[in-house]
């Protein structure tokens, strides 16, 4: 078992996770510190802020609460497995599979 210790102090195995292993405070903390675009921006723009902006845009467009929540959580897996820039990510099928598993767990928790 390969685990990491999360912000909240819990042991987390990103390859064997279940919805019960996911804690929103761990996701929020990690995403607030993770810069979009591999850090190749002229200013710090966190994945967390991006997620909040996506949810706010969904609300401004009159989308349902469920759609707003989906927008908020669309990058939640990156809170545990970090981010890889899209030009590389598309070639990493194992990463995509793990990311999808995390996304499904987050959707389950949010009843999406």
Task: Report residues per predicted region.
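Alpha-helical phosphate/pyrophosphate-handling elements in metalloenzyme active cores
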Residues: 40-66
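Alpha-helical scaffolds flanking conserved acidic
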Residues: 24-27, 62-76
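N- or domain-start disorder-to-order transition segments that initiate the globular core
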Residues: 7-22
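Conserved alpha-helical "signature site"
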Residues: 1-4, 36
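Active-site-flanking alpha-helical
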Residues: 77, 81-82
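Conserved small/polar residues in nucleotide/adenosyl-binding loops
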Residues: 101-110
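Active-site flanking loop/helix segments enriched in acidic
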Residues: 28-46
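Post-HEXXH active-site segment of zinc metalloproteases
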Residues: 84-96
